[in-house]
């Protein structure tokens, strides 16, 4: 039975520079390969990011307008397989979720 995986981008499948210059983000290939394998196994992959949400004080419309094309291009360039890219995730220091898992625990590092 397939599952739906919602995956963060920055700090999860890529490293990003201080100050959040997303164009300088570097892919973490090993992690992308794990997510791509889940995709290949028939699971649904959704990337969900807070890119721009802090900068635009929670205005998802501005974050989407500014960062959607850049982010989509990066995911494609990095070879990410996915079904959906969602911007507008609220910016936070801590996310509490009954279905959440820490990225280091998930990827085993």
Residue ranges, per PLM feature:
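Catalytic phosphate/metal-binding cores of nucleic-acid and nucleotide-processing enzymes, i.e., regions
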Residues: 1-109
């Amino acid at each position: 039975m397939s599952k739906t995986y919602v995956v963060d981008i920055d700090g999860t499948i890529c490293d990003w520079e201080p100050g959040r210059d997303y164009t300088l983000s570097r892919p973490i290939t090993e992690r992308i390969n794990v997510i791509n394998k889940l995709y290949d196994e028939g699971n649904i992959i959704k990337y969900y990011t807070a890119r721009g949400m802090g900068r635009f004080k929670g205005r998802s419309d501005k974050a989407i307008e500014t960062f959607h094309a850049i982010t989509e291009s990066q995911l494609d360039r990095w070879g990410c397989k996915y079904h959906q890219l969602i911007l507008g995730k609220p910016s936070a220091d801590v996310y509490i979720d009954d279905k959440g898992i820490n990225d280091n625990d998930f990827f085993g590092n």
